[in-house]
Amino acid sequence: MESASREDYLRGMYHLMEEEGSVRSVDLADYLNITKPSVSEMLHELNREGLVQYKKYSRLKFTSKGHEIAKKLTFKHRIIESFLKDVLKILDHYISIYKD
C-alpha cells in the first residue's frame, strides 16, 4: 500500500488497541504496510487535529474525540463487512482483497 487515509490510521490504531492493548507507531506502520516516516508524519497531523496523543518513542493514545471517531469508523466498516459476508455471501477471500 502506497498511502493511507486518516480513516485507515484511526481504524488501524483502534484495531491494534483492541488486539494488543497498546500501540507503537512501528506497530501501526507494520499493520498498514507503510513506512515509519509516513506514519510519523500522519501521526503528527492527527496530533495537531486533536485526534491522537503522539510523542516520539512512546505509545500512541487516542484523545476522547479521536477514540469516538475511530470507534464509529470501525463500527461502520464491520457492518459493511458483515453485510458482504452474511447477506451477499461474499467469501472472506474476496472481502480481504478489497478490505481497505
Task: Show the residue positions of the predicted features.
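Short, hydrophobic-biased segments on the C-terminal half of alpha helices
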Residues: 43-44
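N-terminal helix-turn-helix DNA-binding core of bacterial DNA-binding proteins
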Residues: 2-34
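Amphipathic alpha-helical dimerization/coiled-coil segments
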Residues: 78-100
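A short, conserved structural fragment
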Residues: 47-55
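Basic, amphipathic "hinge/linker" alpha-helix immediately C-terminal to the N-terminal HTH DNA-binding motif
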Residues: 58-77
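Key DNA-contact positions within bacterial/archaeal DNA-binding proteins
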Residues: 37
